[in-house]
A protein has these predicted regions:
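Sec/Tat signal peptide C-region and signal peptidase I cleavage site
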Residues: 18-25
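Bacterial N-terminal signal peptides that target proteins for export
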Residues: 1-13
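Small-residue-enriched, tightly packed secondary-structure blocks
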Residues: 26-231
Length: 231
């Protein structure tokens, strides 16, 4: 009986992995990086609906997950693949991108539409340490809050300053701060291998001076454009 249950679990896990792969079948890491850069540019170009400049400038890392999809076979019903970039040790410039998978959470599908883009700002070292772990859950392993919207919006409330991660989503053109409690993030080792030709960990990529691919360099250039530190 135990063996039968184990076989069932393994089979179910295989179906989930296969189905998740089918959602992104044929899409390369380079194409997804380009889409991530487009998402950032479109959001920041909105006159009164972008992420406040002050927050982006203060952030330690950013997670961009374009096109999160509804997926009934995933626990939590939602699945996405995206990238993390963190500031270099000097505090200026951005690292090569590391790949992540996102599952569960509430990404704004109530607004309508079949896909949602998400952006997460990691605001302090504690949040970065959580981000570099093998897996963590927003709201449980790291404090999270809906980020303020508007290029000149105030970022000085206690809630925003205490949160380790500020989160946003965009669906059907509507961009808003939304608390993504319950969403889990984990490394996407397959995509990292595709980009860099070896099985590097996210920590090695973000903290080890890994050279970015061409598409990764373009995303970093966009981040520098919108979040250059002046100090």
């Amino acid at each position: 009986m135990k063996l039968k249950r184990l076989e069932t679990v393994c089979l179910s896990a295989g179906i989930v992995c296969l189905s998740a792969g089918m959602l992104y079948g044929g899409e390369t890491a380079a194409a997804r990086l380009t889409t991530s850069a487009e998402v950032l540019t479109e959001i920041m170009a909105a006159p009164d609906q972008g992420i406040p400049d002050e927050l982006l400038e203060k952030s330690q890392c950013i997670v961009i997950v374009p096109g999160i999809k509804k997926a009934a076979f995933i626990v939590g019903g939602q699945y996405g693949k995206g990238f993390i970039e963190c500031r270099r040790a000097s505090g200026k410039g951005w690292s090569a991108p590391a790949a992540v998978k996102v599952e569960g959470g509430s990404f704004g599908f109530q607004i309508g539409g079949s896909e949602t883009d998400a952006i997460m700002l990691v605001m302090n070292k504690k949040g970065v340490d959580k981000l570099l772990s093998s897996k963590f859950t927003l709201g449980a392993d790291a404090s999270v809050a809906a980020g303020p919207v508007g290029r000149s919006a105030s970022a000085n409330t206690d809630l925003k300053m205490q949160a380790e991660i500020l989160t946003y989503s965009r669906s059907r053109g509507v961009f808003a701060g939304i608390a993504l409690d319950g969403a889990t993030l984990r490394p996407d080792n397959e995509t990292n291998t595709e980009m860099y030709g070896s099985r590097l960990t996210n920590k090695q990529i973000l903290r080890g001076g890994t050279k970015a691919t061409e598409a990764g360099t373009e995303l970093a250039a966009d981040l520098n454009k919108y979040s250059t530190r002046k100090e």
